[in-house]
Amino acid sequence: MATETLDKQKTIDLRKKHVGPSCKVFFDHDPIKIVRAKGQYMYNEKDEKYLDCINNVAHVGHCHPDVVSAGAKQMELLNTNSRFLHDSLVLYAQRLQATLPEKLSVCYFVNSGSEANDLALRLAWQYTGHKDIITLDNAYHGHVSSLIDISPYKFHQMAGAEPSQHVHVALSPDTYRGKYREDHPDPATAYAENVKEVIEEAHKKGHEIAAFIAESLQSCGGQVIPPMGYFQKVAQHVRNAGGIFIADEVQVGFGRVGTHFWGFQLQGEDFVPDIVTMGKPIGNGHPMSCVITSREIAESFMSSGMEYFNTFGGNPVSCAIGLAVLNVIEKEDLQGNALHVGGYLTQLLEDLKKRHPLVGDVRGRGLFVGLELVRNQSKRTPATAEAQEVIYRLKEQRILLSADGPHRNVLKFKPPMCFSREDAEFAVEKIDQILTDLEKAMVLQRPEAAILETGHIKRKDASDENGLVHPSNGNSHKHTSTIPLSKKTKRN
């Protein structure tokens, strides 16, 4: 058991006293104090084990021994800034580039996803000579000022906030809840035409487009999977307008989607972005990130006459850790695990949808999966309070899951890549039980696929900054799961 010097309440008190109040924790009314972690599990101060279904930072598993060892050995030998020559920088850049199309060959190492996306904007502005950025509704790209401006997920939260005159918001390519849905004959073209319309409106105002930026699969926006062909069509419109395409892989890169190493590759081999940004999983918890672009764009950035330097970006310890992460992904076939376990998880959730009127949609690729809850399947009324109830009750079962999307009603699975079939069964079994309890409490009826909206749970709408709603104090009903599991999984 890990040794902690403070009891939980003392830690909470000191955090309130010394840490900014806008820096929130999960489950704000009763946060979990985590003292150690290993693989896909996290442990509190009582050494109670939680299944981590949301931590895409610990990509190859919490505290993976190969990653820990690589960082420790390099730290004992050398850690300095990138103005000194050292092999790990160039070897790591070479390994990263080998996972990408040949055109993407030049790396800039930085320290966070926000730094990476901010630098990507600078590259776009310099290369095109234009100023305006197109972003997607509900997108999130980072917390620095330039990125809050292009993150509707954030600026929509601020009363009266409007995007800057140089930022244009296109429709999110959401085929479940968006303007063009799964019954549309060609949603990719329809959503891409919206981007073209945004460009034309900008031109009417005398504005020129520098870049279109999008997460390869929207995460905070609700696990949105763009329709096939969408990126190709958007890139054509944007490039015709003199702009470039930035693929934000901070959330979904490094094999998480299973079939491919990068999320943008789901669109097909004929699509190559002009800039790719990566972060979060790249260092398995170590702060590092990267921007990779073409030689042409890099030379344009150099032509400004301003040197680019980042004190910690590409330091020897970060590069050693990054190399270790790539080695573990390959050695343990974690991309293959994401494909097979993710497919199994998706199938279990699809089975839930057949039995539970609260489940509106299941969508995802690999170990990036969303379960959207609704009060009415035909109207797709968001079940926001119910989604929060689920994640709080899962916490009581020692399963960590979050809800996101514009209505905070999408349960998000993005666990460490060592997540197993047994973990998937355990999590879905508990969700099955909780949904059954909630549906009983709501006194729902199910004529065909529709459910009544009149009986939803009465509760205070006490959303906190994490998008979590404090749960009711009602007791759960006892329930025997009917989910067809290959075997029941017991947890300590």
Curated annotation (Swiss-Prot):
Gene3D superfamilies: Aspartate Aminotransferase, domain 1, Type I PLP-dependent aspartate aminotransferase-like (Major domain). Its cofactor is pyridoxal 5'-phosphate. It comes from the Eukaryota. Its main location: mitochondrion. Keywords: Lyase, Mitochondrion, Pyridoxal phosphate. GO terms for biological process: embryonic hemopoiesis. It catalyses: phosphoethanolamine + H2O = acetaldehyde + NH4(+) + phosphate. It is found in: Mitochondrion. Residues 462-492 are annotated as: Disordered. CDD domains: OAT_like. Signal peptide: none annotated. Its EC number is 4.2.3.2. The modification N6-(pyridoxal phosphate)lysine is found at K280. It is an enzyme of class 4 (lyase). InterPro entries: Aminotrans_3 (IPR005814), Aminotrans_3_PPA_site (IPR049704), PyrdxlP-dep_Trfase (IPR015424), PyrdxlP-dep_Trfase_major (IPR015421), PyrdxlP-dep_Trfase_small (IPR015422). GO terms for cellular component: mitochondrion. One of its GO terms (molecular function) is transaminase activity. PANTHER family: ETHANOLAMINE-PHOSPHATE PHOSPHO-LYASE (PTHR45688:SF1), PTHR45688. Belongs to the class-III pyridoxal-phosphate-dependent aminotransferase family. Catalyzes the pyridoxal-phosphate-dependent breakdown of phosphoethanolamine, converting it to ammonia, inorganic phosphate and acetaldehyde. Homotetramer. This is Ethanolamine-phosphate phospho-lyase. It comes from Danio rerio.
